[in-house]
Structure formats: C-alpha cells, structure tokens
C-alpha cells in the first residue's frame, strides 16, 4: 500500500496482527500515523502518481474513533446517544463495569452532549468506539483533551477491553509513556 501527498509518501508492507494485540503508534507529526489509521478504516484517500488506487482495504469490521471531535451538534443527552449507538454493549454488565465506570460515563448520562467539555466528549467517544462490535478497533489520539489521570485510565480501559475481548487495536498516541503504564 502506498499513499502519496505532495512530497510525502507512506509505504506500508504486508504485516500481521493477532487477537488480544494492541499496536501503539508513536511518532512525530506528519509521519502518517493518522493516514494509516484512516486507510484501515476505509477512508477515501489519494490516488498515487500513476493514477492507481493507493490502497486496498482488507475485509474486517472496524470501530473507529477519529482524532478530532465531531463538530456535529448532538441535541440529545449522553444517555440517548449511548442507547442509540451502542445499546447492546450498554446492556452488558462487563462493558459497564470495565469501560463505562472507569471512564465515569454514568455521571454524564443526563447531560446534553453539546454541553460537555472536550475531555468529557473524548471519554464518551472512546466508550462509543469500544461499545461497537468489531474485529479491529482503530483509536486515534484517545488521550486528547484528557488530564494526566484520565489519560492513564483511558489507556488501561483500552488495554483491558482489547485483551478480554480478544480483539486487535491500533492506537495512536503522542505520549507512549501513558500507554506503557
């Protein structure tokens, strides 16, 4: 797979990943981490210099948490958003105890999504991502807008969830120290 954007070229060789594996991507800005995640998510990207399609997406189900928070206005409560987007996960005791409680989603349930802070929205977005049934979880910058304690908690939640569910994840962080804990 090759992605070309001006002078920037991202080449990916064939690789493998297994269940219960988290691949953490670290690197300087502009090195292709988000582009790689978007490729796996199936986002439309560029055409290479020869005019051919730049990537082929393997067939698997994906749950994707974008690095940027949506500017879309959700005129609903967090409870309604969760019940609409991940009703099955929210009904599972293990998901509630392993994801919702550590991320403190319960205390946000009756708040309007639009009125949440950036960190609160980030925690909800992470819960929504993990609440979707998928083979691979693509988690782009899950620690953005979170304070240091919340970053550690979010990293532990991701790790525990992926290991227990025997899934694979690609996670992009600016700080590898946080995920290593």
From Swiss-Prot:
Binding site for ATP: 27-34
Annotated ranges, domain ABC transporter: 20-176
GO molecular-function terms, A-Z: ATP binding; ATP hydrolysis activity
SMART domains referenced in this protein's UniProt entry, alphabetically: AAA
Entry keyword annotation includes Nucleotide-binding: yes
Summary of the tissues where the protein is detected: Mostly expressed in roots and leaves, and, to a lower extent, in stems, flowers and siliques.
A Pfam family that the UniProt record links to this protein: ABC_tran
Keywords, alphabetical: ATP-binding, Nucleotide-binding, Transport
Recorded family membership: Belongs to the ABC transporter superfamily. ABCE family.
Protein name per the record: ABC transporter E family member 3
Source species: Arabidopsis thaliana (Mouse-ear cress)
Lineage: Eukaryota, Viridiplantae, Streptophyta, Embryophyta, Tracheophyta
Gene: ABCE3
